[in-house]
Amino acid sequence: MSTSDPRASLAAYAATPSAQTFDAAEYARFYEQPPNVKAFALDLWYARGQNFVVGYADAQSGACFSRLAQPDEYVVLLPDATTTVSIKCNGNSRTVEGESIAFVPAGDSELRVSGVGRLILMFTTRSEDLCALCSNNASYRLPHGNIPPFAPWPEPVGGPAIRAYSLDVPDEEGRFGRIWRCSTFMVNVLPAQQGPRDVTKLSPHHHDSFEQGSFALDGAFTHHIRWPWTANLNAWRKDDHEYCGSPSLAVIPPPAIHTSRAMASGLNQLIDIFSPPRKDFSEKQGWVLNAEDYPMPA
């Protein structure tokens, strides 16, 4: 990893993985498949990891998305300025403008779209009905290894409520991306890249015990993934060098070494997804932009 990468200061990046068996990465190229759900003014694609489900929506004015008895908090990411979403949840309502991220509490909720644009929705796999819609659900018929059971983080200060934050946050020296968290997710909207990434400045690293979802919103990325070698040759896996256009989701398993390289000549935008939130990122002062609203576990 480049020493200029803020993540180089994290202790976990120097650790040696102790896992002995390994699962494959997952790749969902939404642009190559029909939507999993078609509704009025709304096309939805779903794919999943061990703990999370990601939904990608192409939406037009009048589109409606609802959840009844949603078991836990979920995420609504609005990357486009042309989209506005009215969110109703448990008798409360809030209008969220485009270029925002919102967190919606458990219970009954409804999203109504004005304008045209994209939505990225994130749920835990406690939403079993959404798991069943995922294009790669069969890959998780048996739980993947090296990942502890999901445990939510504490409720927000002041209790459950619809919360929203602008994505318009300038880059800052020493801070990694633009990170928000809730009780169920951590989302990092990485700096947009223009053109292919410099091959001399990649950032290979690994995670010991959690998956990473890397959602390509714009452009294209090649995900380079290498699994550790152990004494057991039967556990070895070939490297992945997977080209994914957008929209797409790569799910990177622990403890594989990985890095993603922007490939397109224009805009390349990647969003990293973790469920539950990452403790190491949360411990870095100033990295989580809404840390005052969502406490860490005691």
Predicted regions and their residues:
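Generic N-terminal amphipathic/basic segments
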Residues: 1-48, 61-66, 71-75, 80-101, ...
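C-terminal functional regions that serve as terminal interaction/effector modules
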Residues: 2-28, 79-80, 211-298
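A short, N-terminal "cap"/entry segment at the start of jelly-roll beta-barrel domains
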Residues: 2-56, 128-201, 297-298
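A cross-kingdom feature marking solvent-exposed beta-strand/loop segments within repeated
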Residues: 51-70, 82-121, 193-200, 224-259, ...
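Double-stranded beta-helix
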Residues: 116-161, 261-298
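Short consensus segments that form the blades of beta-propeller domains
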Residues: 203-205
